[in-house]
């Protein structure tokens, strides 16, 4: 069947009054793209009939987006899309159309649906990305029109499924050989040779080998060589002074001194000949409750035992010796037992 001859009248307007460009080839083939929805509603057939005086090439949108059909490059002076805006905004479809249209060609989208602000901006953005210019949105008719630039260099299409595109290639800027080698050595995980290893000693300064000394506060009166036990400063705020005062108070009060009567020594002196002093005191325990303790001071001078070696230490004491567990002492020395050794005292 011979296609109808193109006329200027058929090319000057579309079915719903959209004025078309007459600067393109009036005898070229018009590309009409439809969908299943537009075919069922009759919009696809109506768009084809609008160009009855021209040669029309018809395609379904899903065939183009799926890559089943390819379009010839720089062939069509006009493309008419009878699809909805979701299908028309497909980057694959718009890129393919941009490659297939001639310079200064016209693209018309008739979705037969209302165009709101968000939909129009989305379609317009996709058309700009694909490389189209002179984009116009007709809210009353629900149509969008755009043009392909006169020169291919003004397009920055993202590519098409047919493999032919007028998009500008993105070329990687090659650096010099020295910069490439420097970058390669920067990301290298292994040194090129053993000479590249850094001597750790070279990273140290002379001052790093000198032992550091602690910083001393100006009001601290604790000097070096005063013994292992630390003395609290004059203005102590760390609690050391309170701990030392508590230790001193406990050492002076929580002591029980044995009498010779408690020593169970067969040859020990009788109480009449032994000096004995008893002191009863009330102290506050760690649990906050008052406790009554008895301090007994006994002069062990002249005290003897069956073995006579109790003062030498546990190695010379029998199992019933009252001095068992105490350090060695001199004969006649006061024997003191801390309260902490027996909770019942």
UniProtKB/Swiss-Prot annotation:
Native organism taxonomy: Eukaryota, Fungi, Dikarya, Basidiomycota, Ustilaginomycotina
Region (Linker): 167-210
Gene name as annotated: DRE2
Binding locations of [4Fe-4S] cluster: 307, 310, 318, 321
Free-text comment about domains: The C-terminal domain binds 2 Fe-S clusters but is otherwise mostly in an intrinsically disordered conformation.
Position of sequence motif Cx2C motif 1: 307-310
Motif Cx2C motif 2 in this chain: 318-321
Gene Ontology CC annotations of this record: cytoplasm; mitochondrial intermembrane space
UniProt name for this protein: Fe-S cluster assembly protein DRE2
């Amino acid at each position: 069947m011979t296609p109808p001859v193109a006329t200027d009248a058929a090319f000057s307007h579309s079915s719903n009054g959209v004025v078309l460009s007459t600067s393109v080839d009036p005898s070229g083939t018009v590309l009409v793209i439809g969908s299943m929805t537009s075919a069922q509603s009759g919009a696809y057939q109506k768009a084809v009939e609008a160009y009855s005086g021209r040669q029309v090439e018809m395609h379904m949108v899903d065939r183009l987006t799926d890559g089943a059909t390819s379009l010839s490059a720089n062939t069509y002076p006009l493309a008419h899309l009878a699809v909805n805006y979701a299908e028309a905004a497909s980057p694959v479809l718009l890129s393919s159309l941009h490659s297939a249209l001639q310079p200064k060609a016209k693209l018309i989208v008739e979705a037969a649906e209302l165009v709101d602000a968000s939909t129009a901006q989305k379609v317009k953005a996709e058309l700009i990305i694909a490389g189209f210019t002179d984009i116009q949105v007709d809210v009353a008719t629900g149509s969008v029109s755009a043009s392909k630039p006169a020169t291919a260099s003004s397009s920055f299409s993202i590519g098409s499924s047919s493999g032919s595109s007028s998009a500008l290639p993105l070329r990687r800027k090659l650096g010099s050989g020295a910069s490439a080698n420097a970058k390669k050595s920067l990301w290298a995980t292994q040194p090129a040779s053993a000479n590249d290893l850094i001597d750790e000693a070279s990273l140290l300064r002379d001052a790093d080998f000198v032992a550091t000394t602690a910083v001393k506060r100006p009001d601290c009166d604790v000097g070096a060589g005063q013994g292992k036990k630390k003395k609290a400063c004059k203005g102590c705020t760390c609690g050391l002074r309170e701990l030392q005062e508590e230790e001193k108070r406990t050492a002076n009060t929580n002591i029980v001194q044995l009498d010779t009567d408690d020593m169970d020594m067969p040859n020990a002196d009788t109480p009449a000949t032994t000096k004995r002093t008893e002191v009863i005191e009330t102290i506050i325990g760690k649990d906050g409750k008052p406790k009554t303790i008895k301090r007994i001071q006994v002069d062990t001078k002249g005290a003897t035992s069956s073995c006579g070696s109790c003062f030498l230490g546990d190695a010379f004491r029998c199992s019933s010796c009252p001095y068992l567990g105490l350090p060695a002492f001199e004969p006649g020395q006061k024997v003191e037992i801390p309260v902490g050794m027996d909770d019942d005292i």
